């Protein structure tokens, strides 16, 4: 599944890249989306729960939209506002291993909101030390958050309900281990952290403590042109979405060792 922000759609492709279907259009209705952020730039996020339901961060409409596995509308989650559980530009979604729904909300001072997949507010909000939380990933114990304007990655131990960051790494720069405009993050089964940098046109790999391990730069194993999203599949492949040239790049995760 690919979120096509410019066309207000979710597009579905097969494993070989063959187009299958598209869901949605531009607007404010049940199966309509608006992915424009306050800057005018397209934004939004997508994830799938254990039953195959699809969750979309409908950024411009300040809500999350839930679809079934065939793209049919199920419900909206959240409302616009500044109160607990409300959204102002939700931009990314993560479904954790317990089917909890985590939503990054950029314009409410920077926070992450927890919901159930049925749309019940979970009363936990992470706000500490966040400026511009653009993406979130998880494993059974931790959330990993890309804080774009700080050029940092922050980890939170959600298993104990603590909203304070446990690890912070990165910092502005172009050297290995530094970050410039990081926009997306993903974890592998070993807890390694993969970070996409639009500013440096590259992907870096860190271990679960935030120590640098490897990188793929533009023009080495793939061509990057404002990379904006990353997905690790079950076969050990990395898929990267390039915003400027509207392409997907695929590579073997073992190249980052």
Where are these regions (language model features)?
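Flexible "stalk/tail and boundary" regions
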Residues: 1-257
């Amino acid at each position: 599944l690919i979120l096509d922000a410019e066309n207000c759609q979710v597009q579905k492709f097969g494993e070989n890249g063959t187009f299958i279907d598209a869901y949605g259009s531009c607007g404010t209705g049940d199966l309509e989306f608006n992915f424009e952020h306050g800057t005018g730039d397209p934004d939004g996020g997508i994830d799938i729960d254990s039953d195959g339901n699809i969750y979309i961060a409908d950024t411009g409409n300040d809500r999350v939209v839930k679809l079934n596995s065939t793209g049919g509308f199920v419900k909206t989650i959240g409302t616009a506002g500044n109160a607990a559980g409300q959204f102002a530009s939700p931009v990314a979604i993560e479904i954790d291993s317990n089917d909890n729904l985590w939503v990054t909300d950029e314009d409410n001072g920077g926070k992450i909101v927890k919901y159930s997949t049925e749309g019940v507010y979970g009363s936990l909000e992470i706000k500490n030390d966040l400026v511009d939380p653009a993406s979130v990933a998880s494993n059974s114990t931790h959330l990993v958050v890309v804080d774009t304007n700080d050029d940092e990655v922050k980890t939170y131990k959600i298993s104990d309900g603590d909203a304070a960051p446990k690890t912070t790494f990165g910092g502005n720069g172009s050297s290995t281990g530094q970050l410039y405009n990081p926009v997306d993050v993903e974890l592998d089964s070993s807890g390694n952290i993969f970070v996409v940098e639009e500013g440096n046109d590259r992907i870096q790999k860190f271990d679960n403590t935030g120590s640098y391990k490897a990188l793929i730069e533009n023009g080495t194993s793939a061509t990057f042109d404002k990379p904006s999203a990353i997905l690790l599949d079950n076969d050990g492949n990395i898929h990267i979405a390039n915003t400027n040239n509207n392409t997907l790049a695929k590579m073997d995760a073992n190249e980052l060792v």
